[in-house]
From Swiss-Prot:
Source organism of this protein record: Salmonella typhimurium (strain LT2 / SGSC1412 / ATCC 700720)
Keywords from the UniProt entry: DNA-binding, Transcription, Transcription regulation
Key word Transcription present: yes
Keyword NADP attributed: no
Boundaries of every HTH lysR-type domain copy: 8-65
GO biological process: regulation of DNA-templated transcription
Protein name: HTH-type transcriptional regulator YidZ
Role played: Involved in anaerobic NO protection.
Domain of life: Bacteria
DNA-binding residues: 25-44
Family classification: Belongs to the LysR transcriptional regulatory family.
Alphabetized Pfam families for the sequence: HTH_1, LysR_substrate
GO molecular function, one term: DNA-binding transcription factor activity
Length: 319
């Protein structure tokens, strides 16, 4: 028999979403500012409503049942639509708007000053929160914790970062494509040698730990050639790798997007760029499509539409 929504306390759905996110009664209670006992009672009501355990206890926390997993996306969509409904007056007035972004750095650092000025000009009392793009950023977009993401994906056929592998709930727009360059200190000894693959591999490399991986399409291309680079240093972002590559006393080299030349000029880093020593077919596998990502439920959200247009315009002007 179909149950009526009028018989369900909608606060229980908020509790259910937080339990799914936290996988812990105690942590969910903390976020709701209630006691763990109150959350346990809510979970009991939810189990009775759905006639399913929803979660089972494990040594690692609460594990969702198959039914709970099947409801996760619908629940996130429902909560996001509820937030948009409550935020409706903010689309008529600039007061109180929040902008939540997840972006690759230094890409955001190049444009953030101009972007923030545009946001505050249009929405004077808006607040902005920017987080670095990370392995869980797509999930944050799905959960409604991030309005829009801005990051590079990959083109190598074997990459797990292909645009074609994005979740169906994610919409995207490619703003520009970038072929990474090799960045070396101005007095680096490699600059006195013929620039070829042997020279490129002769020196130690700085790598980026990207979405919990120290390797990327470059390493796949090298593997296909039966070659390998020596990764001597792994860092969390491109700005750190460029900073280290510019320091004296070592022979480290960095590979970073071509757009980083704007970042280097801004910070006056003494770096010289060289092309990746590969043929055209190999370089095609290394192209990085820099992409805006948002949830489909936000495709017609006025705030997100405006933000996408603002970032698009800035990219054409600055990159």
């Amino acid at each position: 028999m179909k149950k009526s929504l009028t018989n369900l306390d909608l606060n229980l759905l908020l509790c259910l979403q937080l339990l799914m996110q936290e996988r812990s009664v105690t942590k969910a209670a903390k976020r709701m500012n209630v006691t763990p006992s109150a959350v346990s009672k809510s979970l009991a009501k939810l189990r009775a409503w759905f006639d399913d355990p929803l979660f089972v206890n494990t040594p690692l926390g609460l594990a969702p049942t198959p039914l709970m997993v099947s409801m996760e996306q619908s629940l996130a969509d429902w909560m996001q639509m509820g937030n948009q409904l409550l935020d409706k007056p903010h689309h008529q007035t600039p007061r109180g708007l929040k902008f939540e972004l997840a972006a690759e750095s230094p890409l955001m650092m190049i444009m953030f000053n101009s972007l923030s000025q545009q946001i505050y000009q249009r929405y004077p009392q808006a607040t902005i929160k920017v987080r670095n793009w990370d392995y869980d950023s797509l999930e944050a977009i799905t959960r409604g914790e991030v309005d829009i993401g801005f990051t590079g994906r990959e083109s190598h056929p074997r990459s797990r970062e292909l645009l074609s592998l994005l979740p169906l709930a994610i919409d995207f727009e490619v703003l520009f494509s970038d072929l990474p360059w090799v960045w070396l200190r101005e007095d680096h000894p490699a600059l006195r040698e013929a620039w070829d693959l042997d020279t490129f591999l002769r020196y130690p490399h700085i790598s980026i730990c990207w979405e919990q991986s120290d390797t990327w399409a470059l390493d796949d291309v090298l593997q296909e050639m039966g070659r390998k680079r020596h990764i001597a240093l792994s860092l969390p972002g491109f700005e750190q790798s460029l900073f280290m590559a510019a320091q004296p006393g070592h022979t480290l080299i960095a590979t970073a997007p071509r757009y980083c030349q704007h970042y280097n000029q801004l910070h006056q880093l003494p770096l010289v760029a060289r092309p990746l020593p590969f043929d055209a077919q190999q370089r095609e596998k290394l192209m990085v499509p820099f992409t805006l990502l948002w949830h489909k439920r936000n495709s017609h959200n006025p705030k997100i539409v405006w933000l996408r247009q603002a970032i698009n315009t800035l990219c054409r002007r600055l990159i």
